[in-house]
C-alpha cells in the first residue's frame, strides 16, 4: 500500500473540484543515473473547463508522488492524451501500455515492445482449433509436475509459467465459433496499432541511418528485416480477415 490519503480526504476530493492554474509540477526522483536533476517536471494544465482539476487527475499525481518509484506505473494505450496529464515526455510505449519513467524517454521502447509483440506465448496456431479444456489441463499438469512448460514441438515459452513471460496470447481470435461484438473488434485494433507503431519506429531509425556518413550496412539490413518481420507478425496474429 502506498496511497497515504485517508478515506475522509478521498471523500473530500470526490465531493469538490480543486481550482488550478497552469503550472509546473515537480516529483523527486531517487537513484536514477539517467536523471541528473533528481526530479521530473512537467506542465500541468487545468483539465476541467480551464479552471480546475478533475478528481482522476489529482489521483494520478498522488499515485506518482506516493509510489516514489518503488513500483512501476503504467497507462493503457487507450488512455487519451488529455488523461495523461502532460506526462508524455516521460512515457514510453511497450505494447498495449505506456510506462512512466523517472527520466525523459523516447516515445517507443523498441526493445521491450519487440519482446512483447514478437514472442509466441501459448499455442502457436491462430486458435482456429483451440480447445479450452485440453489447453488448461495440459498447462495445469505441467505446473504440478514441476517441469518446464513446453509445447508439443518441445519448445519453451508456450504456456502458463510461474515466471514472467513476455508477449501476448491471441487465443481464439481465429475461432469462428466465438462471437466478437463491435466494441471488441475496435479494441483489437490496438494490437494492430502497436505493430504499426513499432514498424514505423524502425522505419524512422532506418531513414536516420541512411543520412549518416558512415552508415552501417549491417544495421540497415537488421532494421529492414525487423520492419518486415513486425508487419508479417501483425498479419499472422491480427489479420484483416479470418
Regions found by a protein language model. Name each.
Residues 1-242:
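ER/secretory pathway lumenal C-terminal domains and tails of membrane proteins involved
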